[in-house]
């Protein structure tokens, strides 16, 4: 790896690739050995190679940090991780908070520029602190690529519904008449009309349940004619009828991957911020690392980000947690560094 760039944003030689602006400046000790420090020859700032990443001032091996993050997205709670890995609970909590912040920045920077042709949205009910403090997790999925582009945590209100659709459409490339399907929640129709107007096909699928079984399915075409919906379904590679099956399957994936969403346990989040950060880790893992079985082409199994053209290979947590270092090197040395970790250069 090339030497890192100076993290000082006001340094005059920060992006000067032709000059030797960074020099080795000794080592510092950690529990897993010693780490290299650097010194900027222009502004005299001293720093380590992990400055600004999830590994900054980490006293343990990076592999252990990655293992904790991997366990957290497989439905393992913090107490179980602490017992299995022999790490203090507070350390596990602090690491996951740090990983969540890193994944949030990674998602905000790289989940942009995808095509939005068929969209489904839904919400999950859970609670934070106590059962009386109910919150809802709004999520959307791009059906063709299985990409999970956006999520909002909060009350089941019009503002949060509007925020979900605004975020998904602001991140996407413009496309004519996307097919949007949701359930019968009252604010979905208003939010779709506010964000995209009549330039889409929007339908609601309303399921009536009795004794926990679906006894009736009603389809309402809110925006668009019957012929337009039939044409859109013929062009779709995944949907034969109007449905919410894909977003409901994503909801199941979230409940399996997030210990905070497991029913009838004591693993609920104590604060809303904890739930949001854990969901950012899961979203990053789902989009960029975990191969999706529905995206198998021959011997190749792709991630949703690969299918959407946002990455050219599966990313590991190591590459995701070090993405800021690669980003700084991109500005200094060019495209090759970012391509090396599998991200599309135009979004790095």
Question: Which positions does each model-derived feature cover?
Answer:
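Residue-level recognition of single "structural anchor" positions
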Residues: 1-348
